[in-house]
Amino acid sequence: MDRTQTFIKDCLFTKCLEDPEKPFNENRFQDTLLLLPTDGGLTSRLQRQQRKSKLNLDNLQKVSQLESADKQLEKRDYQRINKNSKIALREYINNCKKNTKKCLKLAYENKITDKEDLLHYIEEKHPTIYESLPQYVDFVPMYKELWINYIKELLNITKNLKTFNGSLALLKLSMADYNGALLRVTKSKNKTLIGLQGIVIWDSQKFFIMIVKGNIIDEIKCIPKKGTVFQFEIPISDDDDSALRYSILGDRFKYRSVDRAGRKFKSRRCDDMLYYIQN
Protein backbone atom coordinates (compact mmCIF):
# COMPACT_ATOMS: atom_id res chain seq x y z
CA MET A 1 0.00 0.00 0.00
CA ASP A 2 1.37 3.43 -0.89
CA ARG A 3 2.52 5.62 2.03
CA THR A 4 1.44 8.77 0.23
CA GLN A 5 -2.16 7.76 0.82
CA THR A 6 -2.94 9.36 4.19
CA PHE A 7 -6.40 7.86 4.62
CA ILE A 8 -5.29 5.11 6.99
CA LYS A 9 -3.18 7.37 9.15
CA ASP A 10 -5.55 10.34 9.26
CA CYS A 11 -8.87 8.51 9.46
CA LEU A 12 -8.06 5.29 11.30
CA PHE A 13 -4.93 5.52 13.37
CA THR A 14 -5.64 9.03 14.71
CA LYS A 15 -8.98 7.82 16.10
CA CYS A 16 -7.75 4.50 17.49
CA LEU A 17 -4.25 5.28 18.70
CA GLU A 18 -2.73 8.10 20.74
CA ASP A 19 0.35 8.06 18.50
CA PRO A 20 -0.64 7.56 14.85
CA GLU A 21 3.01 7.00 13.91
CA LYS A 22 3.47 4.06 16.26
CA PRO A 23 2.52 1.28 13.76
CA PHE A 24 4.94 2.73 11.26
CA ASN A 25 7.75 3.04 13.76
CA GLU A 26 7.32 -0.54 14.99
CA ASN A 27 7.22 -1.86 11.40
CA ARG A 28 3.79 -3.32 12.05
CA PHE A 29 2.43 -1.70 8.96
CA GLN A 30 3.60 -3.05 5.60
CA ASP A 31 3.89 -1.01 2.49
CA THR A 32 2.28 -3.64 0.25
CA LEU A 33 -0.69 -6.02 0.49
CA LEU A 34 -0.16 -9.53 -0.85
CA LEU A 35 -3.18 -11.11 -2.59
CA LEU A 36 -3.30 -14.79 -3.65
CA PRO A 37 -5.45 -16.07 -6.51
CA THR A 38 -8.48 -18.21 -5.55
CA ASP A 39 -10.47 -20.95 -7.36
CA GLY A 40 -13.88 -19.53 -6.57
CA GLY A 41 -14.53 -21.93 -3.69
CA LEU A 42 -14.07 -25.08 -5.81
CA THR A 43 -11.61 -26.68 -3.39
CA SER A 44 -13.86 -26.19 -0.39
CA ARG A 45 -16.83 -27.66 -2.24
CA LEU A 46 -14.83 -30.71 -3.26
CA GLN A 47 -13.65 -31.21 0.28
CA ARG A 48 -17.22 -31.07 1.60
CA GLN A 49 -18.35 -33.63 -0.99
CA GLN A 50 -15.49 -35.95 -0.10
CA ARG A 51 -16.39 -35.76 3.58
CA LYS A 52 -20.02 -36.58 2.82
CA SER A 53 -19.21 -39.46 0.48
CA LYS A 54 -16.48 -40.92 2.63
CA LEU A 55 -17.36 -44.44 3.82
CA ASN A 56 -15.50 -46.01 6.63
CA LEU A 57 -15.35 -49.71 7.43
CA ASP A 58 -18.23 -49.53 9.89
CA ASN A 59 -20.57 -47.98 7.35
CA LEU A 60 -19.67 -50.61 4.75
CA GLN A 61 -20.35 -53.39 7.22
CA LYS A 62 -23.72 -51.87 8.14
CA VAL A 63 -24.70 -51.58 4.47
CA SER A 64 -23.70 -55.18 3.74
CA GLN A 65 -25.58 -56.42 6.79
CA LEU A 66 -28.74 -54.57 5.73
CA GLU A 67 -28.51 -55.95 2.18
CA SER A 68 -27.99 -59.53 3.39
CA ALA A 69 -30.91 -59.19 5.82
CA ASP A 70 -33.19 -57.94 3.00
CA LYS A 71 -32.15 -60.84 0.75
CA GLN A 72 -32.75 -63.41 3.48
CA LEU A 73 -36.16 -61.91 4.23
CA GLU A 74 -37.10 -61.94 0.54
CA LYS A 75 -35.90 -65.54 0.20
CA ARG A 76 -37.86 -66.64 3.27
CA ASP A 77 -41.00 -64.91 1.97
CA TYR A 78 -40.64 -66.58 -1.44
CA GLN A 79 -40.08 -70.01 0.12
CA ARG A 80 -43.04 -69.52 2.45
CA ILE A 81 -45.37 -68.41 -0.37
CA ASN A 82 -44.17 -71.20 -2.66
CA LYS A 83 -44.59 -73.78 0.10
CA ASN A 84 -48.04 -72.49 1.00
CA SER A 85 -49.16 -72.61 -2.64
CA LYS A 86 -47.99 -76.21 -2.99
CA ILE A 87 -49.75 -77.18 0.23
CA ALA A 88 -52.95 -75.44 -0.86
CA LEU A 89 -52.90 -77.16 -4.27
CA ARG A 90 -52.27 -80.57 -2.70
CA GLU A 91 -55.07 -80.06 -0.21
CA TYR A 92 -57.44 -78.93 -2.97
CA ILE A 93 -56.70 -81.98 -5.12
CA ASN A 94 -57.00 -84.42 -2.22
CA ASN A 95 -60.22 -82.78 -1.02
CA CYS A 96 -61.74 -82.93 -4.51
CA LYS A 97 -60.83 -86.59 -4.93
CA LYS A 98 -62.23 -87.47 -1.52
CA ASN A 99 -65.53 -85.68 -2.19
CA THR A 100 -65.76 -87.25 -5.65
CA LYS A 101 -65.51 -90.72 -4.10
CA LYS A 102 -68.24 -89.79 -1.63
CA CYS A 103 -70.49 -88.65 -4.47
CA LEU A 104 -69.94 -91.87 -6.41
CA LYS A 105 -70.75 -93.85 -3.28
CA LEU A 106 -73.95 -91.85 -2.76
CA ALA A 107 -74.91 -92.38 -6.40
CA TYR A 108 -74.41 -96.14 -6.03
CA GLU A 109 -76.33 -96.35 -2.76
CA ASN A 110 -79.28 -94.28 -4.05
CA LYS A 111 -79.15 -95.81 -7.55
CA ILE A 112 -78.75 -92.43 -9.27
CA THR A 113 -77.48 -92.65 -12.83
CA ASP A 114 -78.13 -89.12 -14.10
CA LYS A 115 -75.56 -86.39 -13.49
CA GLU A 116 -78.05 -83.57 -12.94
CA ASP A 117 -80.11 -85.67 -10.53
CA LEU A 118 -76.99 -86.54 -8.54
CA LEU A 119 -75.89 -82.90 -8.29
CA HIS A 120 -79.40 -81.85 -7.26
CA TYR A 121 -79.50 -84.60 -4.61
CA ILE A 122 -76.07 -83.68 -3.18
CA GLU A 123 -76.93 -79.97 -3.15
CA GLU A 124 -80.01 -80.67 -1.04
CA LYS A 125 -78.75 -83.44 1.24
CA HIS A 126 -75.02 -82.71 1.46
CA PRO A 127 -74.38 -78.98 0.81
CA THR A 128 -70.85 -79.05 2.25
CA ILE A 129 -69.82 -81.74 -0.23
CA TYR A 130 -71.53 -79.91 -3.10
CA GLU A 131 -69.62 -76.68 -2.42
CA SER A 132 -66.25 -78.43 -2.59
CA LEU A 133 -66.98 -80.47 -5.73
CA PRO A 134 -64.91 -79.63 -8.83
CA GLN A 135 -67.16 -78.79 -11.77
CA TYR A 136 -65.98 -78.79 -15.36
CA VAL A 137 -68.20 -75.83 -16.25
CA ASP A 138 -66.29 -73.55 -13.88
CA PHE A 139 -63.04 -74.10 -15.81
CA VAL A 140 -64.42 -73.69 -19.35
CA PRO A 141 -63.81 -69.87 -19.38
CA MET A 142 -60.21 -70.59 -18.45
CA TYR A 143 -59.89 -72.44 -21.76
CA LYS A 144 -62.13 -70.44 -24.09
CA GLU A 145 -61.49 -66.91 -22.85
CA LEU A 146 -57.89 -67.13 -21.66
CA TRP A 147 -55.86 -69.93 -23.19
CA ILE A 148 -57.20 -69.79 -26.76
CA ASN A 149 -56.59 -66.03 -26.99
CA TYR A 150 -53.15 -66.50 -25.42
CA ILE A 151 -52.03 -69.25 -27.81
CA LYS A 152 -53.39 -67.43 -30.87
CA GLU A 153 -51.51 -64.29 -29.95
CA LEU A 154 -48.36 -66.31 -29.19
CA LEU A 155 -48.39 -68.09 -32.56
CA ASN A 156 -49.75 -65.06 -34.44
CA ILE A 157 -52.61 -67.10 -35.89
CA THR A 158 -54.95 -65.30 -38.27
CA LYS A 159 -57.68 -66.46 -40.65
CA ASN A 160 -55.17 -66.32 -43.49
CA LEU A 161 -52.76 -69.21 -42.89
CA LYS A 162 -50.54 -68.31 -45.85
CA THR A 163 -48.34 -66.19 -43.59
CA PHE A 164 -48.27 -68.80 -40.81
CA ASN A 165 -44.77 -70.04 -39.95
CA GLY A 166 -45.06 -73.69 -38.88
CA SER A 167 -41.46 -74.24 -37.74
CA LEU A 168 -41.51 -71.10 -35.61
CA ALA A 169 -44.84 -72.19 -34.14
CA LEU A 170 -43.34 -75.51 -33.01
CA LEU A 171 -40.55 -73.68 -31.22
CA LYS A 172 -43.03 -71.41 -29.46
CA LEU A 173 -45.28 -74.33 -28.53
CA SER A 174 -42.36 -76.07 -26.83
CA MET A 175 -42.04 -73.06 -24.53
CA ALA A 176 -45.74 -72.20 -24.19
CA ASP A 177 -47.85 -72.31 -21.04
CA TYR A 178 -50.47 -75.08 -21.05
CA ASN A 179 -52.38 -74.06 -17.94
CA GLY A 180 -55.94 -73.84 -19.25
CA ALA A 181 -55.38 -75.95 -22.38
CA LEU A 182 -57.83 -78.64 -23.44
CA LEU A 183 -55.78 -81.84 -23.81
CA ARG A 184 -56.76 -85.33 -24.87
CA VAL A 185 -54.75 -88.50 -24.23
CA THR A 186 -54.20 -90.34 -27.54
CA LYS A 187 -51.51 -92.86 -26.52
CA SER A 188 -50.30 -94.06 -23.16
CA LYS A 189 -48.60 -97.01 -21.52
CA ASN A 190 -51.56 -96.99 -19.14
CA LYS A 191 -54.41 -98.06 -21.42
CA THR A 192 -57.06 -96.77 -19.03
CA LEU A 193 -55.93 -93.19 -19.69
CA ILE A 194 -56.45 -93.33 -23.46
CA GLY A 195 -59.36 -91.14 -24.52
CA LEU A 196 -59.41 -88.95 -21.41
CA GLN A 197 -59.96 -85.28 -22.18
CA GLY A 198 -59.87 -82.36 -19.81
CA ILE A 199 -58.76 -78.81 -19.08
CA VAL A 200 -55.33 -78.40 -17.51
CA ILE A 201 -55.58 -76.64 -14.17
CA TRP A 202 -51.89 -77.06 -13.35
CA ASP A 203 -48.88 -77.97 -15.50
CA SER A 204 -46.45 -79.56 -13.05
CA GLN A 205 -43.07 -81.11 -13.76
CA LYS A 206 -44.24 -84.71 -14.15
CA PHE A 207 -48.02 -84.44 -14.43
CA PHE A 208 -50.79 -82.62 -16.22
CA ILE A 209 -53.43 -82.03 -13.53
CA MET A 210 -56.73 -81.84 -15.41
CA ILE A 211 -60.42 -81.46 -14.68
CA VAL A 212 -62.19 -84.23 -16.60
CA LYS A 213 -65.86 -84.15 -17.55
CA GLY A 214 -67.50 -87.34 -16.29
CA ASN A 215 -70.80 -89.08 -17.00
CA ILE A 216 -71.87 -89.01 -13.35
CA ILE A 217 -69.50 -86.57 -11.68
CA ASP A 218 -66.58 -84.40 -12.82
CA GLU A 219 -63.18 -85.46 -11.52
CA ILE A 220 -59.67 -84.12 -11.13
CA LYS A 221 -57.06 -86.49 -12.53
CA CYS A 222 -53.26 -86.36 -12.45
CA ILE A 223 -52.11 -87.64 -15.85
CA PRO A 224 -48.40 -88.58 -15.90
CA LYS A 225 -46.38 -87.11 -18.74
CA LYS A 226 -44.08 -90.11 -18.96
CA GLY A 227 -45.21 -92.59 -21.58
CA THR A 228 -48.16 -90.46 -22.70
CA VAL A 229 -49.02 -88.57 -25.89
CA PHE A 230 -51.37 -85.60 -25.58
CA GLN A 231 -53.26 -83.90 -28.38
CA PHE A 232 -54.80 -80.44 -28.56
CA GLU A 233 -56.43 -78.24 -31.18
CA ILE A 234 -56.22 -74.50 -31.80
CA PRO A 235 -59.36 -73.16 -33.51
CA ILE A 236 -58.59 -70.79 -36.36
CA SER A 237 -61.89 -68.91 -36.34
CA ASP A 238 -65.28 -69.04 -34.68
CA ASP A 239 -67.12 -69.25 -38.00
CA ASP A 240 -66.17 -72.84 -38.87
CA ASP A 241 -64.68 -75.94 -37.26
CA SER A 242 -61.22 -75.57 -38.83
CA ALA A 243 -58.38 -75.92 -36.35
CA LEU A 244 -54.67 -76.65 -36.06
CA ARG A 245 -53.93 -79.97 -34.37
CA TYR A 246 -50.73 -80.70 -32.47
CA SER A 247 -49.42 -83.56 -30.35
CA ILE A 248 -47.28 -83.39 -27.23
CA LEU A 249 -44.81 -86.13 -26.31
CA GLY A 250 -45.01 -86.16 -22.55
CA ASP A 251 -41.50 -87.60 -22.17
CA ARG A 252 -40.08 -84.41 -23.68
CA PHE A 253 -42.24 -82.16 -21.52
CA LYS A 254 -41.09 -83.30 -18.10
CA TYR A 255 -40.22 -79.77 -17.06
CA ARG A 256 -42.12 -77.09 -15.25
CA SER A 257 -43.74 -74.47 -17.45
CA VAL A 258 -41.49 -71.81 -15.87
CA ASP A 259 -38.33 -73.79 -16.66
CA ARG A 260 -39.55 -74.77 -20.12
CA ALA A 261 -40.10 -71.11 -21.07
CA GLY A 262 -36.37 -70.42 -20.94
CA ARG A 263 -35.21 -73.81 -22.21
CA LYS A 264 -33.95 -74.41 -25.72
CA PHE A 265 -34.97 -77.83 -27.01
CA LYS A 266 -32.30 -79.61 -29.01
CA SER A 267 -32.46 -82.52 -31.43
CA ARG A 268 -31.69 -85.79 -29.70
CA ARG A 269 -32.11 -89.53 -30.14
CA CYS A 270 -35.67 -90.81 -29.94
CA ASP A 271 -35.00 -94.55 -29.57
CA ASP A 272 -36.34 -94.36 -26.01
CA MET A 273 -39.79 -93.65 -27.44
CA LEU A 274 -40.09 -96.53 -29.91
CA TYR A 275 -43.10 -97.86 -28.01
CA TYR A 276 -45.12 -94.95 -29.43
CA ILE A 277 -44.66 -96.42 -32.92
CA GLN A 278 -44.76 -100.08 -31.95
CA ASN A 279 -48.02 -99.72 -30.07
Swiss-Prot record:
- Protein name in UniProt: RNases MRP/P 32.9 kDa subunit
* Subcellular location field: Nucleus
Which residues are modified to Phosphoserine? S64
| Pfam families noted in UniProt | RNase_P-MRP_p29
Which superkingdom is the protein from?
Eukaryota
Biological process according to GO: intronic box C/D snoRNA processing; maturation of 5.8S rRNA; nuclear-transcribed mRNA catabolic process, RNase MRP-dependent; rRNA processing; tRNA 5'-leader removal; tRNA processing
An annotated GO cellular component: nucleolar ribonuclease P complex
Q: Which family does it belong to?
A: Belongs to the eukaryotic/archaeal RNase P protein component 1 family.
GO molecular-function term, one example from the UniProt record: RNA binding
User: Assembly state and interactors?
Assistant: Component of nuclear RNase P and RNase MRP complexes. RNase P consists of an RNA moiety and at least 9 protein subunits including POP1, POP3, POP4, POP5, POP6, POP7, POP8, RPP1 and RPR2. RNase MRP complex consists of an RNA moiety and at least 10 protein subunits including POP1, POP3, POP4, POP5, POP6, POP7, POP8, RMP1, RPP1 and SNM1, many of which are shared with the RNase P complex.
- UniProt xrefs under SMART domains: POP4
Q: What is the lineage of its organism?
A: Eukaryota, Fungi, Dikarya, Ascomycota, Saccharomycotina
What UniProt keywords are attached to this protein's entry? Answer: Nucleus, Phosphoprotein, rRNA processing, tRNA processing
* UniProt function note: Required for 5.8S rRNA and tRNA processing; associated with RNase MRP and RNase P.
The cross-references to SUPFAM superfamilies, in alphabetical order and at most eight, read: Rof/RNase P subunit-like
